[in-house]
Amino acid sequence: MKGNRIITIGRQIGSGGSEIGMEVAKRLGIQCYDRQLIEMACNYGELDQDILAEAEEKRPNPFLYSVPRQMQNDKTGRGIAINDMVFNLQSEVIRRLAEKESCVIIGRCADYVLREQPGVTSVFIYADMNVRIACLMERRRITRDEAITLIKKTDKSRRNYYECYTGKRWGAGASYDVTLNSAELGLDTCVDLICSLYERKQEGDAQAR
């Protein structure tokens, strides 16, 4: 991982966090990894993608406790919960990506997975509730009530997942290097700030050498 710079982005649904991450990667000329991490974890663990997608970014479920015998192999582990298996596989993929290249990684507790690695900047993107509701209503063509329900469900799922595997508070300032209110700052300013931080650290590395 020597010389690689990684930006991890945690986000509230409807905050524009994923869009910010993709634009940061585009501007910096690096890759952004989000949903494709599911496919990469499946390929690494030699598993069916639908099974991993169902358990991905969800707290361990007692009704999905053990990995079916036919799915078990040296990479998945044996006798563990499906959610734990998904977390372990994605964590290994994230570590391999960090070793290979500079990139942006969205969600998946990447800040925690790479906590002992140098060159990692962790960011959390949040926004006011009304802004998130409006965003989801427009993007997904759903009603206000449906947007509120989706926000509450997704927030709960991501919070439980993050706090279960990291022992830290999801969305709390102390859990990340930087927290940004995209509703107040705007998506473009959030992108500018993250890119500026990335470039400063890169310049610092060059001077240190």
Predicted features and spans:
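Pre-Walker A (Motif I) flank of P-loop NTPase domains
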Residues: 3-11, 101
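Short beta-strand-centered segment that lines the nucleotide-binding/catalytic pocket of NTP-utilizing
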Residues: 31-42
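ATP-dependent small-molecule kinase phosphotransfer cores
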Residues: 42-102
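NTP-dependent small-molecule kinase module
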Residues: 91-95, 164-209
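RNA pseudouridine synthases
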Residues: 97, 103, 110-116
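Conserved phosphate-donor/acceptor-positioning beta-strand/loop module used by diverse small-molecule
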Residues: 116-139, 144-152
